[in-house]
From Swiss-Prot:
InterPro entries cross-referenced by the UniProt entry: Glyco_trans_2-like (IPR001173), Glycosyltransferase_2 (IPR050256), Nucleotide-diphossugar_trans (IPR029044)
Annotated keywords: Cell membrane, Glycosyltransferase, Membrane, Transferase, Transmembrane, Transmembrane helix
Keyword Membrane among UniProt keywords: yes
Family the UniProt entry places it in: Belongs to the glycosyltransferase 2 family. GtrB subfamily.
GO MF entry, a single one: glycosyltransferase activity
Enzyme Commission (EC) number: 2.4.-.-
Pfam families: Glycos_transf_2 (PF00535)
Name the UniProt record assigns to this protein: Uncharacterized glycosyltransferase sll0501
Protein's cellular compartments: Cell membrane
SUPFAM superfamilies named among the record's database cross-references: Nucleotide-diphospho-sugar transferases
Organism, as annotated: Synechocystis sp. (strain ATCC 27184 / PCC 6803 / Kazusa)
Topology within the bilayer: Multi-pass membrane protein
Entry GO terms, CC: plasma membrane
Length: 318
């Protein structure tokens, strides 16, 4: 039997949310009168998430489980769920219920109108501090200016993707997965629906500011060469300024006979240029590190157990 809709849910320590998550999902999916599956990816949870998932699977075989061998991170867990999803349309959604399952109706309606990607754009972000809202806004502005692809602002992973979009994403092999960028890169006919993001239902977010910072860097370095170009421009400007200053000192000495003092200014210049060089080396190192990860060609993830699914051939995981 053909599955029309796959719901993909990455999970890490979400035992407190599962009961309400499935209750709301089933309440939404049942009236749609389409064949569906719910792909739950357990990303190395340390609580009772896996046990509760198995109990849910025993009572409802439309709930299927991908149990990863360890914690690979949300982006990889999401990729695993997309790999195993069989539906004609796929909807990734968070397990914390900040993305309302009730919006699935609107996503499906837009898909039936002929759109290939229907993303859910946040009109408001309840339960988040002003600092997080401000940094998120700045991130979308920065990455929008630094990359050639248009990543929709205020949009997470919650969206509907047609099967041809999913197949295109599965062909993208990079190990550093910035899924929002990959979703935008493939193109196709896109539209959006607005929603008010709810506070997290229970538990604490797994994303602290350090993780969010690294996530932002992954997005920038994965989709932009501007950080490399900046140092070319900066180096050229510093070289021209240094040449102009050196010419000024030479002329001043020749015409006025003034000695050139200043060990302090010399030390400041050396330290400044040393700092610039170290930062530029760090940027180059970020790109080289990503090249190193790619050439190792390890699988994106390893699956420990499956419930309701069959193992994919290893070549599909590379």
């Amino acid at each position: 039997m053909t599955i029309e809709l796959s719901i993909v849910i990455p999970m890490y320590n979400e035992e407190d949310n599962l009961e309400h998550l499935f209750a709301r999902l089933l309440e939404v999916l049942t009236p749609l009168k389409i064949t569906y599956e719910i792909i739950c990816v357990n990303d190395g949870s340390k609580d009772k998430t896996l046990k509760q998932l198995i109990d849910c699977y025993q009572s409802n075989r439309q709930i299927k489980i991908v149990n990863l061998s360890r914690n690979f991170g949300k982006e990889i867990a999401l990729s695993a769920g997309i790999d195993y999803a069989q539906g004609n349309a796929v909807i990734p959604i968070d397990a914390d219920l900040q993305d309302p399952p009730e919006l699935i109706h609107e996503l499906v309606d837009k898909w039936r109108e002929g759109y290939d990607i229907v993303y859910a754009t946040r009109r408001s972000r309840q339960g988040e501090t002003w600092v997080k809202q401000f940094t998120a806004k700045m991130f979308y502005k920065v990455i929008g200016r630094m990359t050639e692809i248009k990543i929709p602002p205020n949009t997470g992973d919650f969206r509907l993707m047609d099967r041809k979009v999913v197949n295109a994403i599965k062909q993208l092999p990079e190990r550093t997965r910035f899924m929002k960028g990959l979703f935008a890169w493939v193109g196709y006919r896109q539209t959006f629906v607005l929603f008010d993001r709810e506070p997290r239902f229970q538990g604490q977010t797994k994303w602290n500011y350090w993780k969010l910072w690294n996530f932002a860097l992954d997005g920038i370095f994965s989709f932009s060469l501007l950080p490399l170009k900046v140092w070319t421009y900066l180096g050229s400007i510093i070289s021209l300024l240094s040449l102009a200053y050196a010419s000024f000192l030479i002329l001043k000495t020749i015409t006025l006979g003034v000695d050139v003092p200043g060990y302090a200014s010399l030390m400041v210049a050396i330290l400044f240029l040393g700092g610039v060089q170290l930062i530029s080396l760090g940027v180059i190192g970020e790109y080289l590190g990503r090249v190193y990860e790619e050439v190792k060609a390890r699988p994106l993830y390893l699956v420990s157990d499956l419930w309701g699914l069959e193992y994919l051939p290893l070549e599909k995981l590379n």
